[in-house]
């Protein structure tokens, strides 16, 4: 018998996570399995001080002008180009985060400088400035001052993470072996170990500061770790699981 070889389908390059999610949204209308911005959730929720809708055409520029700088992040979902009346090129980029979507305008040299970042599917970190060009004018200008990829800045933006933990939460409860005394109470004996394991598995460039809060004295013991970490969703979620814990993120270096 002559064996006839069956045609094999051509090998195709595997889609990236973003491409898969975009196809998912095209078919269903929403992201189902994940969101393309999930890797940058810590930045969007703790570093950014604005959403795309906050800087749109109906933005309250008086309020925005009170901020030293406006920081927002999101994924590019649309790009269109054109020309100003003076003949200079311009671009309009639609940025979307978890909460809103807005088209941002880039004019003249600003568009020429950052147009390479305006690719549908790209995740961007955008810095803007709102100011009066002339003291005698009521018009407040809103301009883009910097555009970077979120993937390039997510490990650089957060300079330090401070975790404040009640001292009682790090102590094993008395009589932990007595079921009657500890019924309904959480066993805290492994909290420090679990936290240490989580932090150790997330090496990076961010300074880590631990504050132990003593409820009796009202004082905090502050320790600066020799190790540096990457602040990710798992760490933030672990902190949020403990209702008495607090955390703060700094974008400037601090001294312990």
Regions found by a protein language model. Give the residues of each.
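Noncatalytic, beta-rich nucleic-acid-contacting surfaces in large DNA/RNA-processing enzymes
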Residues: 1-256
């Amino acid at each position: 018998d002559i064996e006839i070889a069956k045609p094999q389908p051509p090998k195709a390059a595997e889609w990236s996570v973003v491409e898969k999610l975009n196809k998912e949204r095209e078919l269903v209308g929403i992201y189902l399995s994940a969101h393309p911005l999930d890797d940058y959730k810590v930045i969007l929720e703790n570093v950014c001080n604005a959403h795309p809708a906050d800087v749109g055409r109906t933005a309250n520029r008086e309020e925005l002008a009170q901020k030293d700088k406006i920081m927002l992040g999101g994924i590019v979902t649309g790009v269109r180009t054109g020309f100003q009346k003076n003949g200079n090129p311009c671009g309009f980029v639609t940025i979307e985060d978890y909460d809103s979507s807005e088209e941002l305008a880039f004019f003249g040299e600003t568009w020429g400088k950052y147009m390479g970042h305006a690719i549908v599917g790209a995740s961007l970190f955008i810095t803007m400035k709102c100011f009066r060009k002339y003291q005698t004018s009521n018009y407040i200008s809103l301009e883009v001052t910097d555009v970077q990829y979120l993937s390039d800045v997510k490990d650089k933006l957060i300079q330090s993470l401070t975790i404040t933990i009640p001292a009682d939460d790090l102590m094993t409860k008395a009589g932990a072996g007595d079921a009657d005394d500890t019924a309904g109470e959480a066993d805290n004996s492994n909290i420090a170990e679990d936290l240490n394991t989580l932090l150790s598995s997330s090496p990076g460039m961010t300074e880590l500061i631990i504050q132990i809060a003593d409820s009796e004295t009202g004082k905090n013991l502050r320790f600066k770790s020799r190790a540096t970490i990457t602040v990710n969703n798992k760490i933030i979620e672990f902190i949020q699981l403990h209702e008495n814990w607090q955390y703060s993120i700094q974008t400037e270096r601090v001294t312990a």
